[in-house]
Amino acid sequence: MEPNGTVHSCCLDSIALKVTISVVLTTLIFITVAGNVVVCLAVSLNRRLRSLTNCFIVSLAATDLLLGLLVMPFSAIYQLSFKWSFGQVFCNIYTSLDVMLCTASILNLFMISLDRYCAVTDPLRYPVLVTPVRVAISLVFIWVISITLSFLSIHLGWNSRNGTRGGNDTFKCKVQVNEVYGLVDGMVTFYLPLLIMCVTYYRIFKIAREQAKRINHISSWKAATIREHKATVTLAAVMGAFIVCWFPYFTAFVYRGLRGDDAVNEVVEGIVLWLGYANSALNPILYATLNRDFRMAYQQLFHCKLASHNSHKTSLRLNNSLLSRSQSREGRWQEEKPLKLQVWSGTELTHPQGSPVRTRLSHSSCLLSLSLLSFIWKLGTWIHHRRPFQPSLHISA
């Protein structure tokens, strides 16, 4: 009985562990997809965010969104089942997508650091340095490097030790790494961008401190200290998240290339892999939420939904109140009018084809719409009392 109880306890622990891991991975996937969808939606609905500076942030969000949709779900299934069940051909496609999107995500972060470095260190020449053509070339460069290190290398077998494109074990699916591929991929994808990002963000931090000290002569010492603290926290969060998420993975990646594909424990390999994926969930927070324009766009985006809901409820209460007051003196015409008003208030929240799309809804617009509702209702009531024998005209009006 004791051995059976021990086995049962181990099984329960295993099931509980799997459930916990599945909840964590599912939550991470959801945050990655939802966060990057919000970034793309905010840029598409807010014209103020459609700038060259935000091209790299949109590219980063699109890359992380594809990673959350095309790669992370299969990685979660593979991590929980401990075997690959989708065939060797799809394994090559999956690993190629994984390497390509992770590489593109990191290179987008690298380009963002260069863009901000140019904007802070030489703001007067920034429009000359950062042009649409150069931004387009940078984006093409990101994807050329990413595709070269992923699809091209994996499908030509540049990453394997024996020249084959797939492993011998059909139930395993992970990127093979030889010495050359491990060192080249690690240097191009992570270590070289990390070094340059450290230099650029250090320069940005120094300039931010100098500006805070200059402001200190004009404003209060406390305000300058707060600005300096915010700049420090922001840059520390950006660099800290990047290093914590990706440094363990690329250390294990290069170590596998030097020592062999089985040199790293599978559990450790899975942990560092998902730690790298977590950076895609943090990017919308670090690179968008810390931006004032993006924060305003988020507020307008969510406030629009809340204001639309409140406006609809207020219009319904107004219709019901007007209906109850008019039932004692009006006939069939008053029973149809609230429906007309309700439909009209609904069209206030939609956009007919061919009209310009409203991107935000504020309290003032809600109050204006309610005022117009009240005015039209009073005007219709006045016309009805003046011309009581033409109710059909009042309804159409």
UniProtKB/Swiss-Prot annotation:
Q: Subcellular localization, per the record? A: Cell membrane
Disulfide cysteine pairs (residue numbers): 91-173
Matches recorded under Pfam families: 7tm_1
KW Transmembrane helix (keyword) present: yes
Q: Name one GO biological process term.
A: positive regulation of vasoconstriction
Q: Which Gene3D superfamilies match?
A: Rhodopsin 7-helix transmembrane proteins (1.20.1070.10)
Q: What is its main location?
A: membrane
Q: Provide the site residues for: Essential for tiotidine binding and implicated in histamine binding.
A: 185
Which residue ranges does the entry give as Extracellular-facing topology? 1-22, 82-92, 160-179, 258-266
Q: Where is the lipid attached (S-palmitoyl cysteine)?
A: 304
Q: Which family does it belong to?
A: Belongs to the G-protein coupled receptor 1 family.
User: Any idea what this protein is called?
Assistant: Histamine H2 receptor
Where does this protein come from, organism-wise? Mus musculus (Mouse)
